[in-house]
Design a protein with these regions (language model features):
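Non-ligating segments of multi-cofactor redox enzymes
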Residues: 1-198
Length: 198
């Protein structure tokens, strides 16, 4: 893989405006009930609340990819995790495996009767020819092929949501944290990895 395309959400900058969610829905014309991106607020209404924009994180070692029985989920050369709707059987294994809740299904009810899985594509389309009508209908707009950032990150007014090569956006985030003058770890890191203050 040449680049490792990732998202980072800077919780110190996210203001819970949901602009990223709206940009994604508008850009990709996703069906009602399918939300490729959402904003989650922890301790809502309490001083010190934190909001974070969540979607597929395009994991290097993606658990959804590991459990898919039809191999419809795959990595691109840039490290983006995409899926092939023609191979999806709607089993829902990816939904159970993903810690971010990224895989979405268009209908309610039992798995295998909920339709084809949908998720964030990092605005990179799918296996159909780049920028084709077939690609847009199944996966949304392929902004990466157009040389653009994902719509959610490009729209973010506070630049809380960063998208791009992991090394580059990681450096931007490190510079921000150094400027703030406290820990270099992402919010929630100490809880997730049991590194609380002693």
């Amino acid at each position: 893989m040449s680049a490792r395309m990732k998202f980072i959400c800077d919780t110190e900058r996210c203001i819970d405006c949901n602009g990223c969610v709206t940009a994604c829905k508008n850009e990709n014309e996703t069906p009602w009930g399918v939300n490729r991106r959402r904003v989650v607020t922890i301790n809502d209404g309490v001083p010190g609340e934190q909001s974070i924009s969540v979607a597929c994180m395009h994991c290097t070692d993606a658990p959804c990819l590991a459990v898919c029985p039809t191999n419809c989920i795959y990595h691109t050369a840039d490290g983006i995790v995409l899926h092939n709707k023609d191979q999806c059987i709607g089993c829902g294994y990816c939904s159970y495996a993903c810690p971010f809740g990224a895989p979405q299904f268009p209908e309610t009810g039992l798995f295998a009767h909920r339709g084809k899985m949908d998720k964030c594509t990092f605005c990179a389309g799918g296996p159909e020819p780049d920028t084709s009508e077939a690609e847009f209908k199944k996966y949304g707009r392929n902004r990466i092929a157009e040389g653009k950032l994902p719509a959610c990150a490009e729209q973010c007014a506070t630049k809380a949501l960063l998208a791009g090569d992991a090394a580059q956006i990681g450096e931007i985030y490190r510079e921000r944290v150094d400027t703030r003058g406290y820990g270099a770890e992402l919010w929630g890191w100490e809880i997730a990895y049991n590194r609380g203050k002693k």
